[in-house]
UniProtKB/Swiss-Prot annotation:
GO terms for biological process: L-proline biosynthetic process. It comes from the Bacteria. ATP binds at K16, T175, D176. SMART domains: PUA (SM00359). PANTHER family: GLUTAMATE 5-KINASE (PTHR43654), ISOPENTENYL PHOSPHATE KINASE (PTHR43654:SF1). The keyword Nucleotide-binding applies. The keyword Transferase applies. This is Glutamate 5-kinase.
Length: 374
């Protein structure tokens, strides 16, 4: 089945709109533009689709309300701008969707919400309940309280995480560019447009450039990585220009617009997807070549004897990274032992665990049922 048919038939969509598409060149929110997005999403809703909107714009709106002309560099100033701007962003979306008889809900997420399994499931339940009630959730990172999200995060990644969270059928990333090119077309006039590719293809990241403006955070690379992440749950991604007239309606109608990134066939198990979606891990273990081979080729559990080094501090039950001696991540899994315990039993046979610790929680450091290969 062609990708555009899958987009057309998708029941649950996640739409991410960038700062440049909802602000007046960074000078606060562009209410007319937001009105157009509300109208397009209302049309999708009328066609029977569920839509979750991931919207940038809070910091830009906060800057305008505070009279700032340049994006500040200090984290506390960015947090202040986000706090002020989030009020305006929610108000404008609420009023514009109300014109179409649609209620909206503001949902602010942090990495911690998605890293903790219980909070992850609660967030999923809330979002699915909102969709069932006919509400359009409008999601943003909680920039006001989480410094890492402002400093390192972006809403492209958040869009992919939300797609996986709700098991969306497709992620649509709208930007001020036509889509993906083999090079930055603003610097390389001979750059070729990429209309279709497989999400996660190594050559895609090599094509991507840096951030495009001082207002937003996400460059094309973040969109490529977001598509790769969304593909793990079986969701396709479209990167398209939000300047195209009625772009959402046309995509939903099956028209091939922008760069369409196909997801490989199949959907990863929900718990394994949750492990992959951890952006920040508190620890990792270095494996010898034999352990790497048994994990990747043999489908075996990770035993303490295959661990050469334990890095970071983590508790039992946390997600940890498993890397080879070159530092390449090969797997992630739920550990049966804390970092302190793992250091004591590293390079030891499972039969020696009780003699070392005085007890045995499990014969494996990570059981294969709690392990996901990367």
């Amino acid at each position: 089945m062609a990708l555009r048919s899958l987009i057309a038939d998708a029941r649950r969509l996640v739409v991410k709109v960038g700062s440049s598409l909802v602000t007046d060149d960074g000078r606060g929110l562009d209410q007319a533009a937001i009105a157009r997005w509300a109208a397009q999403i209302a049309a999708l809703r009328a066609a029977g689709k569920e839509v979750v909107l991931v919207s940038s714009g809070a910091i830009a709106e906060g800057m305008q309300r505070l009279g700032w002309t340049r994006r500040p560099k200090e984290i506390h100033e960015l947090q202040a701008a986000a706090a002020v701007g989030q009020m305006g962003l929610a108000q404008v979306y609420e009023s514009e969707f109300a014109r179409h008889g649609i209620r909206t809900a503001q949902v602010l997420l942090t990495h911690g919400d998605l890293a903790d399994r219980e909070r992850y499931l609660n967030a999923r339940s809330t979002l699915l309940t909102l969709l069932g009630l006919g509400v359009v959730p409008i999601i943003n990172e909680n920039d006001t309280v989480v410094t890492d999200e402002i400093k390192f995060g972006d809403n492209d990644t958040l869009g992919a995480l939300v797609t996986n969270l709700i098991e969306g059928d497709a992620l649509i990333i709208l930007t001020d560019q036509r889509g993906l090119y083999t090079a930055d077309p603003r610097k390389h006039p001979d750059a070729r447009f990429v209309d279709e590719a497989q999400a996660g293809a190594p050559e895609l990241e090599a094509m991507a450039g840096g951030a495009g403006s001082s207002i937003g955070k996400g460059g094309m690379l973040t969109k490529i990585v977001a598509a790769k992440r969304a593909a793990k749950s079986g969701a396709h991604t479209v990167i398209a220009s939000g300047r195209e007239a009625d772009v959402l309606a046309r995509l939903a109608g099956g028209e091939a617009i922008g760069t369409q990134l196909r997801a490989p066939t199949g959907r990863m198990a929900a718990r394994k997807q949750w492990m992959i979606d951890h952006l920040q891990l508190r620890g990792r273990v270095v494996l010898d070549a034999g352990a790497v081979d048994k994990l990747t080729a043999g489908g075996k559990s990770l035993l303490p004897i295959g661990v050469t080094e334990v890095q970071g501090e983590f508790a039992r039950g946390e997600v940890i990274s498993c890397v080879d001696t070159a530092g390449r991540e090969v797997a992630r899994g739920l550990t049966n032992y804390s970092a302190a315990e793992a250091r004591l039993i590293a390079r030891k046979a499972s039969s020696e665990i009780e003699a070392v610790l005085g007890y045995v929680s499990a014969a494996e450091l990570v059981h294969r049922d709690n392990l996901v290969l990367l």
